[in-house]
């Protein structure tokens, strides 16, 4: 299941931008 979530997150990040990557890094 984690794999599916990762794919969704990756898609959202690609849409939002690098910025989002920082937020995810802090969360994950």
From Swiss-Prot:
Key word RNA-binding present: no
A GO BP entry: cell wall organization
Function, in words: May cause loosening and extension of plant cell walls by disrupting non-covalent bonding between cellulose microfibrils and matrix glucans.
Organism, scientific name: Pseudotsuga menziesii (Douglas-fir)
Segments passing through the bilayer: none
Top-level taxonomic group: Eukaryota
GO cellular component: extracellular region; membrane
Family note: Belongs to the expansin family. Expansin B subfamily.
Compartments in which it is found: Secreted, Cell wall; Membrane
Stated name of the protein: Expansin-B1
């Amino acid at each position: 299941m984690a794999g599916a979530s990762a794919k969704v997150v990756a898609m959202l990040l690609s849409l939002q931008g690098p910025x989002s990557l920082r937020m995810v890094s802090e969360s994950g």
